[in-house]
C-alpha cells in the first residue's frame, strides 16, 4: 500500500511540467538573398569558408591591440552589459525556483490573559514545518522559467554585441586620431613650403622680377594654411578626447605615428559568401532568443486558462511548556490540496494571451529587421571595398601628376613665363589631394573594420 502511494506521488511529480502549451519554435526564414553579391576584385580568397581570425590577428598594429585590451578592462558600457547579464541570470533563478517544492519552518509564542487581570497570563509555544508545491500540469511555471532563461541568453548576446562594438569603436577612434596627426603634419609641412615660396617671391620683388600682387597672394596662402593648422589642432584634441572616452581612462593617449602605421589584415572571404553567416552575429542571436522567450510567454498565458493545483502539507507542535514542545502527543500534521479554477476575471487571461501573441509577432518582425539590417551592413562594406581602392589609386596618380605640375609651374614662374597664380593653384591642388588621400586611407581602414564586425568578428580574441 505504501509503495502504491509513493508511486502515485512520484507519477504526479513527473507529470507536473511535462505539458507545454507554448507554440513549437520555428526559425523565421531570412528575408534576404541566400548569397551576397561579391565583386571579384573585392575578394581576398579564403580556403573554405569565412572564419573569424580574432581581433588580435586582424589588427596588425600592436598599438591597436593594446588599446582594445585596455578598453575591455575599463569601458563602462561593457561593464554595464556584464551587469545586465548577471541581472538576467538572477531573474531566471528567481523564476525557476517557483517550479520546485518550497519548505518553510516557523516558530512562535502566544501570550493570553484577561483584560481586567482577573485571569492568569498563559503562554503557548508552537513550531512547525510547511511544504508546498504547485503541480505545473499545463506548463505555466515551466514556460515562465523558459522565457527568463531565453532572456538570459539574449543578454549574453547583447554583451557580445557591446564587446564587438567596443572593439570597432576603439580601433576607429585610434585611426581617427592618427588621421588627425597626419593631417596636421601635412598642413605644417605645407606651411613651411608656402613660407619658402613667400621668401622667394619677396626676393623677386626686390629685384623687380615680380609685383606686389604676387607677394600678397603668397601671404594670403600662408595665413589660410595657418587657419587650417588651427583647425587640425582642434580636430586632434577632439580625437584624443574621443579615444579617451571609449578607452574608459584618461591616461595619456598614443602619440603621433602616422596613419600608414595602422595596418589591418584584409578580411578573407570565400567566393560564394552565404547570408547564413549573419546568423552568428550577436544582435541577430539576441533577437532569436527574444523570439523564443516570446513563444514561452504565450505558453504561460495559455496555461492561465486552466486550473492551478497546489499541494500543501505541514507538521506542527504546540505546548504551554517549551521543554515539552516536541514530546510525544504534542504534534499534528495536515495535508491541504488546493485547486484554483479561473471562472471570471473580466477578460484578463484573454487580454494577457493577446498581449503575448502580439509581442511574439513583434519579436518576429524585430528578428527579420535585424537580418535585413545586417545584410545591408555587409553589402555596403563589400560595395565600398572596390570603390575606395579605385579612388585611392586614382588620387595617388593624380598626386604624382600634381607634384610634376608644381615643379614645372615654379620653374615657369621663375623664368617669368607664367604668373604666380599658376603656382598657387598647383600648391592648393597638391595640398587638397594629400588631404583627400589621407581621408580615403582612413575610410578604407574603417570600411574593413566595419566588414570585420558586420560578419560577427571582434568577439574572438
From Swiss-Prot:
InterPro entries: OMF, OMP_efflux, RND_efflux_OM_lipoprot_NodT. It is found in: Cell outer membrane. A lipid is attached at residue 18 (N-palmitoyl cysteine). A lipid is attached at residue 18 (S-diacylglycerol cysteine). The keyword Oxidoreductase does not apply. It comes from the Bacteria. Keywords: Cell outer membrane, Lipoprotein, Membrane, Palmitate, Plasmid, Signal, Transmembrane, Transmembrane beta strand. It is a lipid-anchor. Gene3D superfamilies: Outer membrane efflux proteins (OEP) (2.20.200.10). Residues 1-17 form the signal peptide. One of its GO terms (molecular function) is efflux transmembrane transporter activity. GO terms for cellular component: cell outer membrane. Transmembrane segments: none annotated. Belongs to the outer membrane factor (OMF) (TC 1.B.17) family. Component of the sil cation-efflux system that confers resistance to silver. May be part of a three-component cation/proton antiporter. This is Probable outer membrane lipoprotein SilC. The lineage of its organism: Bacteria, Pseudomonadati, Pseudomonadota, Gammaproteobacteria, Enterobacterales.
